[in-house]
Amino acid sequence: MAGRGGRALLALCGALAACGWLLGAEAQEPGAPAAGMRRRRRLQQEDGISFEYHRYPELREALVSVWLQCTAISRIYTVGRSFEGRELLVIELSDNPGVHEPGEPEFKYIGNMHGNEAVGRELLIFLAQYLRNEYQKGNETIVNLIHSTRIHIMPSLNPDGFEKAASQPGELKDWFVGRSNAQGIDLNRNFPDLDRIVYVNEKEGGPNNHLLKNMKKIVDQNTKLAPETKAVIHWIMDIPFVLSANLHGGDLVANYPYDETRSGSAHEYSSSPDDAIFQSLARAYSSFNPAMSNPNRPPCRKNDDDSSFVDGTTNGGAWYSVPGGMQDFNYLSSNCFEITVELSCEKFPPEETLKTYWEDNKNSLISYLEQIHRGVKGFVRDLQGNPIANATISVEGIDHDVTSAKDGDYWRLLIPGNYKLTASAPGYLAITKKVAVPYSPAVGVDFELESFSERKEEEKEELMEWWKMMSETLNF
């Protein structure tokens, strides 16, 4: 027993050392209180979930606490730093954290893009705590999700803005203070405007996806992009995300692409090629939120125009046009489908309401996460079984393609129906397959592509066989 206990202690010490930069964060935090001081915890934890606002040091503490209690299925990493130097922290939950497992889809939640929209930040901390708790209890739904999905949770994309907003006196925070990053940049207007490119391509012909392919260097050199924006762009391009949601505040609705209107008007329904699945994804969130899906809910503010809202969902352009948003950037630069969820009429509501927001959104957060296992999935390989990366998977009738990841794995979100899928890659013969797609789970469809060189060799052998047969027949 002593030996086993010693090994456990060594493991714990190693874990603590590995995250020392996290545990010692408060001393490094700009404007942090003196070492050893902690803000008074006003609310009690319930089942391991702390229903309170977490300042930057406390956010770190909360994530580290989750990790230390389930190191086998989690890790903490950072995608970069904010303008003021705070780390953009992510907690990952997976049965093999830190590794992309071939065939396993990647999911992300992002909160607090606008620093004064605080509910999403807290809900994502609560979600990480909830997933840990339920996994340890053996909750079958949660265990299956963590074993079949690589889940990335970023509670705050704008920690500088949150600290500014949280420092405002009183319970009611200003509607705008802390919205932007420390440079005064609205992060949800700061992404490359790929909508304008795809709208031109729709008319003149051109690619309908991966519009920033091989352009990381250009992104890094763009002085108009905030450091937070650049960090997320790299994140999106480095990991083969399939599904994502961006959590905001100020209304109650699940918003789907396109966010920017085609004509440039302020309000115009702007459908993407995947309008049907995006509507379904948005409803998968809103339908489990009683306040969001209530058709008789009055507008958040007296003069708000909610006429575009249907069952707690809206097309982005129909609500109001947003150029340079992160939602459309995901869809047009990568394989990732993202919606934007507005969680609360108040942007920074009183702390004692956080538990109610969690109860209203818990099932929605899980339901939306489960949507990643819809549609079609599989591998693209050559005839020798080698993976083909960056193969194109197109769906007849939907003018938006996805591509395979480095292991040849791909995922294509679709609503139920009958489809024709075509896999193609440079130097290979394309293959088309018919597939019937249920609501869930995703149907497995693999493709084996024959290279042109293999086909030429095969045709050469067939010609030689034909010549041999003709020679024998005619006694040449």
Swiss-Prot record:
The keyword Zinc applies. Its EC number is 3.4.17.10. It is found in: Cytoplasmic vesicle, Secretory vesicle; Cytoplasmic vesicle, Secretory vesicle membrane; Secreted. InterPro entries: CarboxyPept-like_regulatory, M14_CPE_CPD, Peptidase_M14, Peptidase_M14_domain. Coiled coil: none annotated. Pfam families: CarboxypepD_reg, Peptidase_M14. It comes from the Eukaryota. GO terms for molecular function: metallocarboxypeptidase activity; zinc ion binding. Interacts with secretogranin III/SCG3. Belongs to the peptidase M14 family. This is Carboxypeptidase E. The gene is CPE.
